[in-house]
């Protein structure tokens, strides 16, 4: 059996059957004539063009015409390269968890996988004799050029520089390989194959891509991207048009005097001497059938007591008798001797307490809280309830074995140690990218953390591995003292150990083991005294787990599952279930209230502004919207006769942070935001946020939430679930149902076929799925796409070019499918552009009083050194196409929902800025407001309750001074927000708690 056939069977088993049958019904057919970020390669005989479009390979006649597809969905194929005899194509594909090289015959037969394994192999190019492929790979810890001999599979490393070398191209005579390098003298180099001698072919301050040798081998063509401009270079001459959007892929030489390349969404031919380019037209048809399903209903104010799901960061006491955890904003304690214990509340206030950890004596708990305004570390005497502030700006912490010190991470992820008694704090390590909670070595001389270990600096993804860090300096031979160097420890090569956050590793008190969450399960492995792995891992939990913690004797571990708390005996493996009897009840309905609006926009499509109307609210819902009459008023009357009333705003992409404390909820309402959607979070933190707000323990918006994003074997952000091989899909979906997720988020390294399985499983449960992908996500039935650009495993965006332009494929697929898109223009340079034009928010009292001081400080720094002149014009040139895309999508019937990826830019402020971008892109203010009200409400299955101001809907609305239907910037002028019938004047929201 051929290797490709064996691979097909293996993939079908791991990822589910390919080509699953679709229900009867007419498919949607889309004919494309443009592609975004597509590559093209001309065959050696000059008769056929190979395109990579939508993650598949297509063949087009050299003079243009219909495209013939070579590959089905699921391979994510890119970078096609013809063999010298024109019989085969090499390409890179992401069929499983890593990029590998493949070849296929030009007739679509004999598909072969050439490389395999845990490393990424990209950008193939044939040797002139057709026996080898040059490619780039991260096998050495950075990207180098390698070759593979096709007959034997033998791999040879070509470049060895510690910088990243990539995008190789063999010279016509086979003596040299050209490549791009990011070494100190950045540029395109050539390396002599037989001697290893290297020379610089082209240096440039711009970012360079994909060399292609001239037919005579004297120089190379390449692409340069320089801010808002791209160049197609031959030697030192730019032959591209002045506004041309040249895609960063290898050009083909049609003759010694003409190149074929991709730009402006099409294939072009251009003479080496310059002049006008000639477009090669093509059409490519895709067809898909999206299966309807019923979204699971969300009850915002359920009747009666509800079980608390948001138990955060449980930790077992040293003697194993109790577990402390956070829920509903407070700390709680339960005994481990009862399967249904009654919790004891340890704190009871309006603030947010979280991240509890026991001192070794079992009498004290350290935790983080915003009880004095900013998030700080505190200690609590469990017996007396006395609390004591230890240090400011502390998040996750761990007690030293002697209990005298706390190792902790500050708000910038800098590792520090504080003496508990004296409260003296010192830095022990520079900033680490969002590591997990530290865990002390038993000798108290070091800590370990789960931290991201990227495979290279070219791309950001990697695995979570164990980072050992010394916390005290040691004497050196010269009599001074220095910190021992960091050490990486990889207990399970190429597999994440812990998911950062509070998921291990946790060093056992006896120093003999570490516990961590691996593949979603509680796992322990033996270690030497210095933490070096000393044996194979053992899985202890029968279910997905989080938050491991040891008893002092090292005999038991507590962990958290979707169904509650667990304690496992490390020796005999027995697991005891502990389900605390903790419930929450929806806040009672508020008294009746009437809002008298001078102007009202109800949020419905095509709806005109109504004048002088009353919105009558009883309990949580609107009972009447009618022309103003004093005799129909009920309860308190809110006089908005001089202002405008619009539906409460929905922020469709934000990441909530416990570091903002309880003020986070107030700041959202202060900007008119009554619902937020959090597309990636710790699952239990997301549930806690929802339950604390719905129960009335905290003021805040409604929370639409998911859990940790589902990803491939490599991850980037903490909490990312590495679905190695797809074996945990069913368990993760079951967990999502059990915890009441509102939707599922998949991330960029998840293979397409796994995404298909997740979409189908989530839809069976009534849960929508969103990701960064458009195709084949569209064909698989995905519900949404995040970011008009965003991170991509390909190293470039298939949704937007380097000049931030999107073409017909993006527009047509989004409009035809009805899939939502959350553009997040503000994080693609938009926020800086608008702030340069008008830094209105910098001194806004909402920012001054509700945000951490660093936010306002950053704003003042922007205002002090604003973008201006040519730099501002360059940024605006990159932002304007994104704005125009939004306008085109909405005019074409597409579904745009406003979101920002805050707090990259400030909460609330960023959403208002995002809507201003949409108006700049051609939307009316009314249509822009709908992207943050009615459209997302319908998309999330919440249209019955949210999104418009109509009788029967929940009373979520905003009163603003001015007229945002005439001037979208007036939406900044929030006077009060009504959320579920509760009136929140802005001045009251700004008052300290």
Question: Where does each model-flagged region fall?
Answer:
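Divalent metal-dependent hydrolysis catalytic cores, especially in the metallo-beta-lactamase
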Residues: 664-684, 702-708, 738-749, 759, ...
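Acidic, glycine-enriched loop/beta-strand segments at the rims
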Residues: 601-614, 627, 880, 906-909, ...
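A flexible loop/linker signature enriched in serine peptidases of the S9 family
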Residues: 50-58, 73-77, 90-102, 106, ...
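Histidine-rich, glycine-flanked metal-binding segment
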Residues: 61-66, 606-646
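Short coil/turn segments that connect the beta-strands within blades of beta-propeller domains
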Residues: 45-47, 85-87, 129-131, 173-175, ...
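Active-site neighborhoods of metal-dependent hydrolases
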Residues: 732-750, 791, 796-921, 993
């Amino acid at each position: 059996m051929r290797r490709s056939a064996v691979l097909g069977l293996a993939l079908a088993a791991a990822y589910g059957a390919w080509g699953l049958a679709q229900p009867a019904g007419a498919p949607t057919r889309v004919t494309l004539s443009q592609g975004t970020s597509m590559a093209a390669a001309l065959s050696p005989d000059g008769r056929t063009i190979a395109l990579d479009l939508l993650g598949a390979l297509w063949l087009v006649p050299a003079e243009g015409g219909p495209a013939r597809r070579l590959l089905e969905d699921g391979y994510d194929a890119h970078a096609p390269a013809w063999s010298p005899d024109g019989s085969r194509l090499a390409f890179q594909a992401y069929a499983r968890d890593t990029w590998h090289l493949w070849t296929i015959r030009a007739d679509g037969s004999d598909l072969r996988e050439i490389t395999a394994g845990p490393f990424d192999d990209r950008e193939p190019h044939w040797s002139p004799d057709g026996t080898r492929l040059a490619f780039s790979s991260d096998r050495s810890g950075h990207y180098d050029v390698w070759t593979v001999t096709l007959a034997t599979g033998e791999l040879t490393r070509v470049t060895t520089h510690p910088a990243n070398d990539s995008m190789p191209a063999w010279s016509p005579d086979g003596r040299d390989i050209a490549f791009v390098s990011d070494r100190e003298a950045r540029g395109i180099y050539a390396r002599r194959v037989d001697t290893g001698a290297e020379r610089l072919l082209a240096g440039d301050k711009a970012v360079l891509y994909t060399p292609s040798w001239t037919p005579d081998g004297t120089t190379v063509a390449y692409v340069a991207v320089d801010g808002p401009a791209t160049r197609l270079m031959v030697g030192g001459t730019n032959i591209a048009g002045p506004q041309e959007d040249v895609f960063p892929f290898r050009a083909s030489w049609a003759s010694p005097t003409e190149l074929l390349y991709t730009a402006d969404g099409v294939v072009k031919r251009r003479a080496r001497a310059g002049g006008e380019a000639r477009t090669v037209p093509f059409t490519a048809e895709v067809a898909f059938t999206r299966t309807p399903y019923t979204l699971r209903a969300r009850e915002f104010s359920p009747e009666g007591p509800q079980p608390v799901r948001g138990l955060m960061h449980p930790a077992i006491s040293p003697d194993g008798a109790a577990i402390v955890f956070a829920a509903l904003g407070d700390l709680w304690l339960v005994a481990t001797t009862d399967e249904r214990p009654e919790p004891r509340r340890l704190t009871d206030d309006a603030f947010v307490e979280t991240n509890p950890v026991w001192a070794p004596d079992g009498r004290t708990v350290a935790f983080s809280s915003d009880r004095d305004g900013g998030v700080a570390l505190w200690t609590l005497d469990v017996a007396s309830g006395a609390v004591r502030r230890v240090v400011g700006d502390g998040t996750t912490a761990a007690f030293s074995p002697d209990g005298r010190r706390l190792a902790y991470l500050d708000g910038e992820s800098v590792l520090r140690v504080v003496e508990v008694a004296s409260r003296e704090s010192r830095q022990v390590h520079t900033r680490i990218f969002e590591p997990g909670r530290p865990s002390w070595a038993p000798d108290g001389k070091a800590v370990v953390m789960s931290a991201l270990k990227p495979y290279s600096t070219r791309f950001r993804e990697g695995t979570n591995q164990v980072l050992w860090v010394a916390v005290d300096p040691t004497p050196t031979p010269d009599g001074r003292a220095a910190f021992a160097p960091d050490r990486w420890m990889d207990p399970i090569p190429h597999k994440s150990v812990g998911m950062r956050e509070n998921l291990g590793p946790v060093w056992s008190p006896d120093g003999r083991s570490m516990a961590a969450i691996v593949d979603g399960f509680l796992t322990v492995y033996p270690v030497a005294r210095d933490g070096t792995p000393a044996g194979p891992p053992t899985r202890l939990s029968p279910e997905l787990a989080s938050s491991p913690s040891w008893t002092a004797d090292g005999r038991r571990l507590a962990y958290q599952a979707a169904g509650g708390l667990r304690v496992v005996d490390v020796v005999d493996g027995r697991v005891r279930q502990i389900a605390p009897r903790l419930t929450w009840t929806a806040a009672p309905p508020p008294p009746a209230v009437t809002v008298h609006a001078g102007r009202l926009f109800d949020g419905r499509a095509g709806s005109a502004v109504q004048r002088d109307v009353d919105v009558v609210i009883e309990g949580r819902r609107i009972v009447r919207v009618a022309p103003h009459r004093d005799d129909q008023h009920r309860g308190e009357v809110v006089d908005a006769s001089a202002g405008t009333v619009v539906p409460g705003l929905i922020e469709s992409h934000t990441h909530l942070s416990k570091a903002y404390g309880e003020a986070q909820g107030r700041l959202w309402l202060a900007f008119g935001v009554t619902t937020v959607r959090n597309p990636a979070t710790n699952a239990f933190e997301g549930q806690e946020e929802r339950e604390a707000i719905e129960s009335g323990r905290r003021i805040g918006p409604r929370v639409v939430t998911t859990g940790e994003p589902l990803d491939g074997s490599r991850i980037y952000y903490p909490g990312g679930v590495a679905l190695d091989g797809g074996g945990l899909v069913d368990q993760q979906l079951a967990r999502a149902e059990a915890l009441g997720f509102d939707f599922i988020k998949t991330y960029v390294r998840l293979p397409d076929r796994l995404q298909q399985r997740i979409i189908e499983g989530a839809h069976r449960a009534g849960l929508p799925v969103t990701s960064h992908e458009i195709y084949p996500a569209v064909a698989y039935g995905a519900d949404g796409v995040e970011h008009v650009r965003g991170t991509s495993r390909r190293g470039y965006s298939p949704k937007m070019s380097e000049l931030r332009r999107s073409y017909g494929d993006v527009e047509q697929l989004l409009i035809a499918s009805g899939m939502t898109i959350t553009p997040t223009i503000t994080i693609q340079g938009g926020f800086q552009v608008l702030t340069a034009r008008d830094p209105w928010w910098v001194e806004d009292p909402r920012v001054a009083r509700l945000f951490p001081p660093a936010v306002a400080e950053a704003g003042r720094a922007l205002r002090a050194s604003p973008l201006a002149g040519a730099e501002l014009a360059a940024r605006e040139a990159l932002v304007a196409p994104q704005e125009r895309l939004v306008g085109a999508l909405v005019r074409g019937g597409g579904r745009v929902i406003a979101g920002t990826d805050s707090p990259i830019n400030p909460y609330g402020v960023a959403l208002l800025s995002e809507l201003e971008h949409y108006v700049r892109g051609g939307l009316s203010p009314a249509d822009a407001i709908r992207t943050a009200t009615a459209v997302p409400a319908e998309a999330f299955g919440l249209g019955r309750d949210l999104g418009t101001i109509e009788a029967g809907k929940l009373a979520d609305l905003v009163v603003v001074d001015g007229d945002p239907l005439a001037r979208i910037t007036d939406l900044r002028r929030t006077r009060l927000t009504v959320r579920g019938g509760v009136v929140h004047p802005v001045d009251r929201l700004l008052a300290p708690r």
